[in-house]
Regions:
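Expand to "…catalyze enediolate/carbanion chemistry for C-C bond making/breaking, isomerization
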Residues: 2-291
Length: 291
C-alpha cells in the first residue's frame, strides 16, 4: 500500500476525496464483481458486519486472490474493530492484498486509529466514529491524530443497537436528536481534524427520492461524500456531491472578483454581497469540481 494520494498512477479525479463509498461483502464474489463494475469512487470490501465468523477466512482468501487494481475506484477494506478476535488475521491479510486503505469500524477515539496505524505502517484510515456509546464522547479527539486519518463517517445502525433504541427516527420520520447530534459532531470533528467528512448510509436502496434528498442535504451541510450499500445508489450520490455548472460559475466569479481586488473585505457579485467566508466556500466548490 502507499501513502494517501501518493500513487503515481492515480488520476486527478481519484486524487479527490471520494464522493461515493460503496460497501460490498468480501465473501461474495458475485457482489464484488458488481461493485467493481459500478461508478463508485471508493469500494469498501467488508470483513466485518456483513461476513459471519465462519466466512471470514474465505472472505480474506477472496480479497488476496483479487488481481491487482488497474485504475478505477480506490479499494478499501473494512476490518474488524480494535479488540476483535478477527483483527489479527485481517491485518495479516493486508500484507498480500492490493488495498488502498482501511475502514476502521467502531472507533472509540484517536487511540484506536493510532493503534491500527502502528500495526500497518501508516496505511490510510477512514474511521467510522459513532457506532458505540463510548465513541460519542471521543469525537473531538481525532483532531490530535498523528496517524494517517483521512476520513471520518458516522453510523446510525450500530449506534442504535448499542443504545438499545427501538428506532433511530422520531414520530415525524426524522432522525431523533441523538442521531442528529452524532451526525453533526462527526461533521465538525472531521473538519476540525482536517479530514474528509462522510455521511452515513441510506438504508432503503430502492428509495431514490429519499436518497437524493438526504445526499443533497448532506452536501449542503458540508459533507463531501456518502457511504453506500448498493450499486444503484452510486449515480445519485455522485451527482449530489458534484458541484453543478451554475455553482462552479458562481464560485469562479467570486474568486475572480477577489483576485481583481485582493484588499477587499466585501464585494458585490450579481447584486449580492459576498465576503471572505464566501471566498473560502468558492474555493471549496472548485476543489470538488470534476471535469
Amino acid at each position: 500500500m502507499h501513502p494517501f494520494g501518493a500513487d503515481p498512477e492515480e488520476t486527478a479525479m481519484t486524487l479527490m476525496p471520494p464522493r461515493s463509498w460503496l460497501f460490498v461483502p468480501a465473501d461474495s464474489e458475485k457482489k464484488i464483481a458488481k461493485a467493481l463494475d459500478s461508478e463508485a469512487d471508493a469500494i469498501i470490501f467488508d470483513l466485518e458486519d456483513s461476513v459471519t465468523a465462519e466466512r471470514k477466512d474465505a472472505a480474506r482468501a477472496i480479497l488476496k486472490a483479487l488481481p491487482p487494481r488497474d485504475g478505477g475506484p480506490r479499494w478499501w477494506v473494512r476490518i474488524n474493530p480494535v479488540g476483535s478476535e478477527h483483527l489479527k488475521a485481517d491485518l495479516k491479510m493486508l500484507a498480500s492484498a492490493d488495498m488502498f486503505g482501511i475502514v476502521l469500524p467502531k472507533a472509540e477515539g484517536v487511540g484506536d486509529v493510532t493503534h491500527i496505524a502502528h500495526r500497518t505502517g501508516n496505511v490510510p484510515i477512514h474511521a467510522i466514529v459513532t457506532e458505540t456509546a463510548a465513541s460519542l464522547f471521543c469525537l473531538s479527539s481525532y483532531r490530535d491524530a498523528k496517524a494517517p486519518l483521512v476520513a471520518m463517517s458516522w453510523g446510525a445502525e450500530d449506534l442504535s443497537a448499542a443504545l438499545g433504541a427501538s428506532s433511530k427516527y422520531d414520530a415525524n420520520g426524522e432522525l431523533s436528536f441523538t442521531y442528529q447530534w452524532a451526525r453533526s459532531m462527526t461533521l465538525a470533528g472531521a473538519v476540525a481534524a482536517g479530514v474528509q467528512p462522510v455521511d452515513g448510509v441510506f438504508a432503503d436502496y430502492k428509495d431514490e427520492v429519499g436518497l437524493e434528498a438526504e445526499a443533497r442535504a448532506a452536501a449542503r451541510d458540508g459533507f463531501t461524500g456518502k457511504l453506500a450499500i448498493h450499486p444503484a445508489q452510486i449515480a445519485i450520490i455522485n451527482a449530489a456531491f458534484t458541484p453543478s455548472a451554475a455553482e462552479i460559475a458562481h464560485a469562479e466569479a467570486i474568486i475572480a472578483a477577489f483576485g481583481a481586488d485582493p484588499s477587499a473585505g466585501v464585494l458585490s457579485i450579481n447584486g449580492r454581497m459576498v465576503d471572505r467566508p464566501h471566498l473560502l466556500q468558492a474555493q471549496g466548490v472548485l476543489a470538488r469540481a470534476r471535469e
